[in-house]
Amino acid sequence: MDIDDEYFNDPEFQLLIQKYLKYLLESLREVKANLYNRDFEKLRQFGHNLKGVAGGYGFDELSKLGGKIETVSSSENFDFLKNLISDFEASLKKRMPPV
């Protein structure tokens, strides 16, 4: 067994993952508000944090989206950001456990 497998399968780590996903889902409303208020700096910060943290939880796709959100926020491209936020929401929701 790979040490990474052991780490990612740890019940305590799985609990942290679920808490992080819940945090991201709760952040989605604020992210959308920042988009429609064209607060590109807050979106850039969100993307930067997502890029840095999501990968540590094994969410490479979310991490890559965070990097794109960070970069595109700097260019203030509203339409592209809107698409990236939609991609983020879809990617996040497919990772949420069924209720």
Where are these regions (language model features)?
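Two-component system phosphorelay core
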Residues: 1-99
